Amino acid sequence: AGVVIGGAIPDCIALAERLDSPVCSGYQHNDSFPGSHPMAAGPLGYNGSKAGMELIAKADVVLALGTRLNPFSPLPGYGIDYWPKDAKIIQVDINADRIGLTKKVSVGICGDAKQVAQQLLAQLSSTAGDTDREARKATVHQTKSAWAQELSSLDHEDDDPGTVWNAEARERESHLMSPRQAWRAIQ
């Protein structure tokens, strides 16, 4: 929430573009980074982006900018225990009591997300992010594309084995559109 509340979205975009680094948003904070941006990997946590989870699992450094790392964002999803075990975690939060509260961090920074992002940008070397830049961009694109294809394949309205709630809802309210029908309609 710190990125949104602090007006740091443009600074977050600038960091992502400077480093060509994928950006995941926290649980229920999809507004913290534009989903249309090429480096947007999507939200983490319950019903989040499988692409984001796969990408963050490969991270060697995670900058948790303006987030308390709530307990829901790093929960496993889609059978992926994605929170990186060996990555250096840098957590930036305006509330010092939240730093390291739910996840072990390598570096904790108590500060405003916007100011910290601007200071980080100013301190980056001219070659920061150059190593494997093109490969990283390709990996982000391929991972997001695979997730988009998987989502578009979810074109059935069948219930999971042993459940009937979809069938009952369709019968009861046939005039309403299911989420999967809505997804297909906007494709």
Predicted segments, located by residue:
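Anionic-ligand anchoring segments at beta-strand to alpha-helix junctions in alpha/beta enzyme folds, i.e.
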Residues: 1-59, 182-187
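Short, solvent-exposed amphipathic alpha-helical segments in soluble enzyme
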Residues: 9-20, 77-82, 107-108, 125
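Phosphate/diphosphate-binding loops
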Residues: 45-98
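Cofactor-binding loop segments of dinucleotide-utilizing enzymes, especially the Rossmann-like FAD-
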Residues: 1, 26-28, 67, 92-94, ...
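Short glycine-/acidic-enriched loop or helix-start segments at secondary-structure transitions
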Residues: 7-9, 34-35, 72-75, 101, ...
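Short, acidic Gly/Pro/Ser/Thr-rich loop/turn segments
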Residues: 4-6, 31, 70-71, 97-99, ...
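Phosphate/pyrophosphate-binding active-site segments
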Residues: 86-187
